[in-house]
């Protein structure tokens, strides 16, 4: 008798519309219950039985119940699932398989089966890629996943690499394909094979894409020719190899090995500027005045060179610093190194006075054994030879940026606009509290930004610099010329790494059009989106593999008294993140390790400080001594404790 009763339907509708609801993201805990986080201030409790319907990270709409002044959330509708495609470890065997996602807050095994056509007999411990097929909030009885790809077996020493690449859906191998002959591009190539070009790289580098030749001019000026490998002499635009490079966008450098953007035959041989091998190049000839200014007579041209020596960073640095036993193989090579060091000095001073120079930071290198085990992690300071190459490349990229801007009006540019205008007033207010007075309008200009950066660099510590980082905008890849505030330059377009960056290949083709006096087509904006996304994924992959290797390396230090110097890099409500100075590992110090009485402890991300009983005990950029309390291999996280 109640069926199809319009009054009852109306009442139901009324009750539904009057019931309070909230949309937010599910945050799981290790205790079975969870929270629906609506925003930074508001969250609702989700009881354990209701948590069975959702997963950590799901965006949902929930009904809010109030009982005895306590509010709780009942999940009702799925807005966006947290898991779609994921990697994990397989449990069980044969017909009863489950997969545990590789995520710190997802501990439950999800029932699954292998996709049709996947020819692998899955067993306990295997790593796999899976896709979610069922979700309780979609009307399904339970969660269910389908295994779509076998990654590797559980005991594979190279799990960190294969799992990480699969997680980010990145290629595992070099692209297929061969380039048999050079294209006829209608370019006249200048024969520079007689000149003493040199390359300076790491000892292990195979994909050398830049060679340098310097010359002193009679009036005290210095001339530099930067010769860059020429893959677009082999790869036609729109060809199969070009399309593959466009998708990859970059060579992916991971600890221990790289996955190249181009076939290895090209990247490590045909295009690589190997010593005593004749190679086609795209070159730029530039002149520096006595104060390091790049003069206006910039010239881009096609050429043929033969590198006369493959030099190694550390050996060149040692020789210039009068240490070590390495000697250049001839006086001609020695003269090149001396002239390049002079250019480096001039350009460094020019950039210091007229642009911005990044502070030197350590690079960390993993030394790996045959089975991917970490034998050591070495800190490599940036030395004079690294700076020689860096100054030459920056100068060459400034030249390309100017030529492309003036001749074409477009290219692939690296653009960084400094501070977000919406943050200018907050930035000025923060700096004022630290005794630095800036004009909120001026700081948004290139000159104003450079002026502030120089003042910050003159500060005794990097604390204030760390505070204002959150107000900065991100660097972008753009087809429009624009300033690069981070470098303090009016325009910056890279073309010096075409073996490893697709954007540099595009700029090569545009520069060749300029050389030939032809018109060129503006690159499509979609390519900049693809490049930015690939750069993001490659960086995440490098970080993920690094985290795994750091956890392996420090595992046997857990619970010991071994001390490490550590710089505080971030402070949050839950504790502090620190970077171990000797090896670059990131570790977390939970708040209870800082002070036992929670009410007397204030960890402020806003201020970058930890206060105990009202006194500042720690701040970002402080260097403290820590020991390793625990290494959690399943989450690749390192927990540290301050030395009392």
Swiss-Prot record:
Molecular function in Gene Ontology: exoribonuclease II activity; RNA binding
Catalytic activity: Exonucleolytic cleavage in the 3'- to 5'-direction to yield nucleoside 5'-phosphates
Alphabetized UniProt keyword annotations: Cytoplasm, Exonuclease, Hydrolase, Nuclease, RNA-binding
InterPro entries, per the entry: CSD, NA-bd_OB-fold, RNase_B_OB_dom, RNase_II, RNase_II/R, RNase_II/R_CS, RNase_II/RNase_R, RNR_Ribonuclease
SMART domains in the cross-refs: CSP, RNB
One cellular-component annotation, GO: cytosol
HAMAP family: RNase_II
UniProt similarity note: Belongs to the RNR ribonuclease family. RNase II subfamily.
NCBIfam families per the UniProt record, alphabetical: 3_prime_RNase, PRK05054.1, RNase_B
Protein name, as recorded: Exoribonuclease 2
Organism: Escherichia coli (strain UTI89 / UPEC)
Gene that this polypeptide is encoded by: rnb
